[in-house]
Amino acid sequence: MVTPNELVCTAAKHGTTTFIVDPHEAANVSGAAGIDYILNQTEKSPANVYVMMPSCVPSTSVDDNGCVFSANDMYPYVRNQRVLGLGEVMDDPAVIHAEESMFVKMNLFENRTIDGHAPYLPNKELSAYKMAGVDTDHEATTFEYALEEVRRGLHVHIREGSAAHI
């Protein structure tokens, strides 16, 4: 394991110019301190480092991870130029059922990108997810599901990683 700055410096030597990170695991462990650590560590890095504000800390209401990161905790970051929007909204039931706490977070980033995380929602739920304000998704692993997401107006991120070809 390396520090965020070490990772960015090494990757920059090989041509990576920009990172967009969702530090939800750092927030799960240490809340705002985890986000501040990443922002501070990468402030003077040789590549651009941007953050998507973690939307689901904990991931769902039944998780017990030690930290809660609410809309009130996010508010100080809203005007930070390196915070681009709201990170992957994993709690799709909170979006679909219009839970107030989720919509307060989404409203903080209303005119910015709101990243999704919607693995195989049925059509009606997928439509509600998009209509609520989610802009993107990276969970489509089949052409058919990606097409359904595009038809509903979501921008599909092509997923390339160790689990992308399972």
Model-derived segments and spans:
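Divalent-metal coordination cores built from histidine and acidic residues
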Residues: 8-113, 154
